[in-house]
């Protein structure tokens, strides 16, 4: 298996479009250009930001309510801003751009990029106000390129792309099989099995390829390809109730192709968010073709897995066993949904495909960051390992009991995602007018909490540069405490619209980290923080090399 880090030049992407698209974009840029109060054309970035007159007013700052138009912004022309992003290749550093802009403009600002317009916030008290206004059917920004792919290919949409009552009905059914405690107890042993197999295979490799040391063997590798295989193997085991054999000596080429397609899909999404995807589809723009082809591969691979699972479950039914299989046998989320019969097969297919596509990079990449941080923080590593060993002994090797007795494992995942959130924003469209930082924000405005600057803000965290899983057992912890005291850990979203695969991902990462810490000591050659890039998810600029030493 290989891990491809795709970071295409977005500006090259638009150059590959037809002349008519470029001309249309340029016309819209010229028409959208406006003059700021200072008498200059609004730019983008520190040198061109446009703060409100008098600076931003905080909540309770003694100023009267201010108009929406007075919110500090990065430039009035979305198309001009977008071209500057392309020319300066800012998409891959969008998280850094957000951090710099907050440092310049204060805790709230507006931004227009192409067709998108958002209000960006980062303080927990403001995020609390936003989530209080999300309503019964919370909405987040629709990834229009994904939706256009479903529509042009006539695929049904899963809950990720739905809104309103239809979203809520489907989501409640999925919660029972993916989020609730009984569901977690059913699939936890499957995740544990894959995590144990991963560590056994890694131990064999370390002893075979590594150097002999006084206490055992040691091997330095880039673990990212193995972590991607682990993530796909684990998620498929939970979704379909069977292994797909990615730990064999000759893993499936189809599965490797699937992983590559997921990365290509993620890499081509950001530039398409700010352009009209249906127009690009009609014109056959190269950027759109790459994106759609990646999704086609994802759907094709998932369809084969789903069809295989459906045939297996129907054979079991014909034999009188029901979709649930033999007594006590877990047949995966696919089998559970089919057994309940409350979702059509087409909707099951749409949601299983979304879960499968969303379950690879979003767990493999945080695991890279977690292993690196443990390697460059040996004292933290020993602290977590000590708690894990004690919990493992008390639980008699029972994974569920061990996780319950090792809260630092959960803190380790939360701390990793604080510094390196997979998705760098969480959006909502308030159903009523709200006031944030003394600014009036109309209902229906896209407001997004920016997680990367949130996790590194000194106004929110003590010593934010320090990697400290133990901080989540203190007063800093919480995801929804009253008065905005929580809302510091939002990597999986919040409330009814949080990530539907959250419990799978959390337990998958905690279990693998637990077994790695029980088996290996980790070290790295550098104590520097990893450089990062944004390709719809945050990931290392270069995958880190980790030294695994047997205990």
Label each region the model flagged.
Residues 378-380, 502-539, 543:
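Cytochrome P450 heme-binding "Cys pocket" and the immediately downstream C-terminal segment
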Residues 1-67:
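N-terminal mitochondrial targeting presequence
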Residues 84-106, 300, 396-437, 458:
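Conserved cytochrome P450 K-helix E-x-x-R motif and the immediately C-terminal K′/meander segment
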Residues 362-374, 512:
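Short, small-residue alpha-helix embedded
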Residues 51, 55-89, 94-190, 194, ...:
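Cytochrome P450 substrate-recognition site 1
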Residues 474-509, 531-535:
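Cytochrome P450 heme-thiolate "Cys pocket" and heme-binding signature region
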Residues 135, 449-479:
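Conserved cytochrome P450 K-helix/beta-meander segment immediately N-terminal to the heme-binding cysteine loop
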Residues 143-147, 151, 185-367, 383:
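Cytochrome P450 heme-thiolate monooxygenase catalytic core
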């Amino acid at each position: 298996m290989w891990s491809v880090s795709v970071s295409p030049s977005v500006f090259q992407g638009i150059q590959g479009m037809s002349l008519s698209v470029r001309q249309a974009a340029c016309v819209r840029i010229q028409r959208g250009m406006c003059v700021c109060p200072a008498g200059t054309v609004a730019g983008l970035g520190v040198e061109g930001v446009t703060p409100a007159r008098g600076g931003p007013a905080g909540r309770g700052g003694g100023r009267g309510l201010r108009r929406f138009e007075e919110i500090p912004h990065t430039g009035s022309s979305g198309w001009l801003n977008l071209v500057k992003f392309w020319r300066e290749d800012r998409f891959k550093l969008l998280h850094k751009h957000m951090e710099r802009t907050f440092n310049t403009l204060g805790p709230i600002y507006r931004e227009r990029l192409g067709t998108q317009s958002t209000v960006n916030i980062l303080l927990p008290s403001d995020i609390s106000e936003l989530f209080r206004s999300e309503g019964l059917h919370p909405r987040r920004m629709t990834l229009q390129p994904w939706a256009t792919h479903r529509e042009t290919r006539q695929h049904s949409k899963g809950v990720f792309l739905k809104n309103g009552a239809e979203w809520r009905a489907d989501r409640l059914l999925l919660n029972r099989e993916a989020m609730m405690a009984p569901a977690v107890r059913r699939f936890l042993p499957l995740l544990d099995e894959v995590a144990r197999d991963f560590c056994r295979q890694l131990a064999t490799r370390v002893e075979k390829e590594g150097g002999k040391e006084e206490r055992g063997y040691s091997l330095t590798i880039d673990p990212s390809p193995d972590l991607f295989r682990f993530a796909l193997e684990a998620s498929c085991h939970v979704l379909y109730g069977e292994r797909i054999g990615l730990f064999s000596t000759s893993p499936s080429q189809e599965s490797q192709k699937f992983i590559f397609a997921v990365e290509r899909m993620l890499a081509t999404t950001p530039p398409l968010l700010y352009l009209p995807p249906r127009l690009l589809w009609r014109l056959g723009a190269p950027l759109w073709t790459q994106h759609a082809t990646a999704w086609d591969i994802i759907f094709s691979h998932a369809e084969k897995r789903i069809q295989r699972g459906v045939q297996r479950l129907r054979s079991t039914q014909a034999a009188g066993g029901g979709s649930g299989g033999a007594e006590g046998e877990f047949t995966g989320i696919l089998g559970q949904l089919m057994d309940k019969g409350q979702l059509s097969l087409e909707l099951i297919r749409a949601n299983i495909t979304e879960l499968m596509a969303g379950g690879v990079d979003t767990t493999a990449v945080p695991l890279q960051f977690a292993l690196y941080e443990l390697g460059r923080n040996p004292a933290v590593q020993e602290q977590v390992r000590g708690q894990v060993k004690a919990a493992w002994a008390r639980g008699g090797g029972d994974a569920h009991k061990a996780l319950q007795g090792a809260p630092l494992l959960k803190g380790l995942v939360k701390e990793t995602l604080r510094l390196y959130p997979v998705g760098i924003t969480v959006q909502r469209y308030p159903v009523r007018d709200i006031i944030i930082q003394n600014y009036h924000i109309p209902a229906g405005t896209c407001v997004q909490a920016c997680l990367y600057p949130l996790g590194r803000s000194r106004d929110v965290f003590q010593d934010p540069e320090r990697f400290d899983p133990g901080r989540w057992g203190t007063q800093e912890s919480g995801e929804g405490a009253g008065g905005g005291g929580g809302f510091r850990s939002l990597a999986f979203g919040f409330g009814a619209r949080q990530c539907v695969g959250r419990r799978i991902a959390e337990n998958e990462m905690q279990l693998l980290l637990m077994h790695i810490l029980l088996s290996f000591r980790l070290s790295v050659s550098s104590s520097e923080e990893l450089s990062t890039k944004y390709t719809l998810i945050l990931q290392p600029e270069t995958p880190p090399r980790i030294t695994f030493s047997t205990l």
